[in-house]
């Protein structure tokens, strides 16, 4: 299933009762000269981008207490600073359904947009909502204030993770109608 967004065309997967689009980039990768800075809107692409797999999650430590580790946490797989992606589940692409945006917990140092997978699928199967989850920078990648330590050379505010979430919400509002969601 191919959907056209303002960033470019993406290919998702048709599941039994819904469509899924995973690992959609919503901002430029926060690496190199973009590290420690506010997110920059994603530049449009020309090819069809495959969005059938979850994107990388922000680097994070394994859980301290082994008994806390459950299938809900994706701490062991595919960690990379290039993690600004989101996921969309929708039962109908030509509708105007309310949008449920899920921002994962984890005390701002662990977790990912994949943590809600089973809940998102269940909610989506119900047919009442379009569900979106996101990855954002965590721990020092998202909350390290460097502007004072570097005499302004690195203008990091220490709120880059929250700015990531805002950038994701902007992308969602601009593009969710392509997935059957109401942008308002």
Give residue ranges: language-model regions.
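Non-catalytic accessory segments of hydrolases
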Residues: 1-159
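Alpha/beta-hydrolase active-site loop
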Residues: 154-178
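Alpha/beta-hydrolase fold nucleophile elbow
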Residues: 179-184
């Amino acid at each position: 299933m191919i959907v056209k967004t303002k960033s470019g065309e993406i290919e998702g997967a048709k599941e039994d009762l819904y469509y899924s689009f995973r690992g959609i980039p919503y901002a430029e990768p926060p690496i190199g000269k973009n590290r420690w800075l506010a997110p920059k809107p994603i530049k449009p692409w020309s090819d069809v981008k495959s969005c059938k797999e979850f994107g990388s999650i922000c680097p994070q430590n394994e859980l301290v207490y082994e008994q806390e580790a459950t299938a809900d946490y994706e701490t062991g797989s595919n960690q990379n600073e290039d993690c600004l992606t989101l996921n969309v589940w929708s039962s109908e692409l030509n509708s105007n359904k309310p949008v449920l945006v899920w921002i994962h917990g984890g005390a701002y140092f662990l977790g990912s947009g994949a943590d809600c997978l089973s809940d998102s699928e269940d909610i989506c199967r119900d047919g009442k909502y379009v569900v979106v989850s996101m990855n954002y920078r965590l721990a020092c990648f998202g909350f390290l204030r460097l502007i004072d330590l570097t005499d302004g050379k690195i203008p990091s505010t220490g709120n880059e993770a929250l700015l990531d979430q805002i950038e994701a919400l902007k992308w969602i509002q601009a593009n969710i109608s392509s997935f059957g969601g109401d942008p308002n």
